[in-house]
């Protein structure tokens, strides 16, 4: 059925549940699993200039952000390991999340995308998160949405 699934993660409880679900599915199907984290472009607002960013330096701040993102992917790897799956990880910066998810899924020949119904943005209820909705709208790859 499915041979390789991409699961996007932002470290939220919603996406951690999607990671666990994807790992169980991959385990039952004998499929590979790719964990993807996407960082949107970071813009420096004018009011931050001269503040903490200038004091610490942009490189130091970016290293801190990258360290946090590595921890986020490491936590997702722990979730997949608990389900008996050794997953691959990928990180991409500078793209909108939905575009990166679709692009990486195509480039890595994934035949399934797994996403949480909502990410860090929250808003629970009946509506899907905006990035999830955009992926559904713009891809032809099957998408499994986890609530």
Model-derived regions: residue spans:
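Structural beta-alpha unit
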Residues: 78-113
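Glycine-rich, Arg-bearing micro-motifs that act as flexible, cationic patches
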Residues: 112-137
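Short hydrophobic/aromatic patches at helix-to-coil boundaries
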Residues: 143-147
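A short acidic, glycine-rich active-site loop
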Residues: 55-71
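Small/aliphatic-rich secondary-structure junction motif
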Residues: 3-56, 79-88
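Short, well-ordered secondary-structure micro-motifs
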Residues: 18, 45-48, 99-102, 125-127
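Aromatic/hydrophobic pocket-lining residues that form π-stacking "cages" and hydrophobic walls in ligand
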Residues: 22, 76, 101, 135
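Short, hinge-like loop/turn segments at secondary-structure boundaries
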Residues: 50-54, 105-108, 131-132
């Amino acid at each position: 059925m499915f041979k390789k699934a991409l699961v996007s993660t932002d470290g939220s409880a919603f996406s951690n549940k999607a990671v666990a679900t994807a790992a169980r599915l991959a385990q039952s199907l004998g499929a590979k699993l790719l964990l993807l984290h996407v960082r949107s472009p970071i813009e420096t607002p004018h009011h931050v200039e001269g503040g903490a960013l200038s004091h610490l330096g942009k490189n130091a701040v970016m290293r801190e952000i990258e360290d946090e993102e590595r921890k986020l992917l490491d936590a997702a790897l722990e979730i997949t390991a608990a389900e008996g799956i050794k997953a691959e990880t990928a990180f991409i910066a500078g793209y909108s999340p939905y575009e990166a998810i679709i692009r990486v899924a195509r480039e890595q020949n994934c035949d399934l995308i797994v996403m949480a119904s909502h990410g860090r943005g929250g808003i629970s209820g009946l509506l899907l998160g905006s990035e999830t909705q955009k992926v559904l709208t713009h891809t032809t790859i099957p998408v499994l949405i986890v609530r």
